[in-house]
Curated annotation (Swiss-Prot):
SUPFAM superfamilies the record matches: Oxidoreductase molybdopterin-binding domain
InterPro entries: OxRdtase_Mopterin-bd_dom, OxRdtase_Mopterin-bd_sf
Protein name according to UniProt: Putative protein-methionine-sulfoxide reductase subunit YedZ1
Gene null: resulting phenotype: Growth somewhat inhibited by chlorite.
Gene it is expressed from: yedY1
Superkingdom of the organism of origin: Bacteria
Regulation: induction: Part of the SigF regulon, induced by chlorite under positive control of SigF. Part of the probable yedZ1-yedY1-mrpX operon.
Family from the record: Belongs to the MsrP family.
Organism of provenance: Azospira oryzae (strain ATCC BAA-33 / DSM 13638 / PS) (Dechlorosoma suillum)
Sorted UniProt keywords: Stress response
Function noted in UniProt: Part of the YedY1-YedZ1 system that may repair oxidized proteins containing methionine sulfoxide residues (Met-O).
Amino acid sequence: MFPKKNRPMIANGDRVLKDAFKDVGKYIELPARRAFLQRSMTLGGLSLLTGCAITDDESVESALLAMSRFNNCVQGWLFDPNQLAPIYPESMITRPFPFNAYYGDDEVREVDAASFRLEVSGLVSDKHAWTLDELHALPQVDQVTRHICVEGWSAIGKWSGVPFTTFLRLVGADLDAKYVGFKCADDYYTSIDMATALHPQTQLTLSYDGQTLPARYGFPMKLRMPTKLGYKNPKYIQALFVTNSYPGGYWEDQGYNWFGGS
């Protein structure tokens, strides 16, 4: 399942902050990583970086949010828009592929294909609503990639759909904008940076493992990004928008890392 909505109060500030610094340190190449960790793995180091007085749980929580924002910057800085995630042979596909959402399998949203329209708005020149037939008529590509969940598990699947960079160019999106946001039929929402949106493996997925995308995996479409953790891959997409205003996200607004790189 997704991370729990109500997180426990942080009681051991030193330990949690050290873990947070280690997470950030993963994204910094040696030798800079050593210097970062040596200078930062104390409450005083965090105070210098965030400007917070670390004296109680509330301050620790605020500091961790500041660290998450810092982590976003580090991940964005290190993200290579041309570096491909690993591709796997079809013999390694996980069958059945796991279902995962913030609700149970028996609560999967059913979307009517005939009436479905993908709404496109924001900094785009073509704002017409797309039918499923129009979307399926666009050139499709396959990828066999690994889905990595923030909870620690992973699974390999075969996803087919429209390269998102192709779609963004087709609708005349402002490719210099900062964000692309998504709204979904299950009330989920999230957003990504433009560099990830233009990554060659970011895909508007319409099919899974040779069949129309099943409802449990996000019919009528999901966004597949092997460069992001699972919670950044929205399902049941109904609307997308291009913007320079930070859109947030369902889990991100509850404290989870916004960049969410895998």
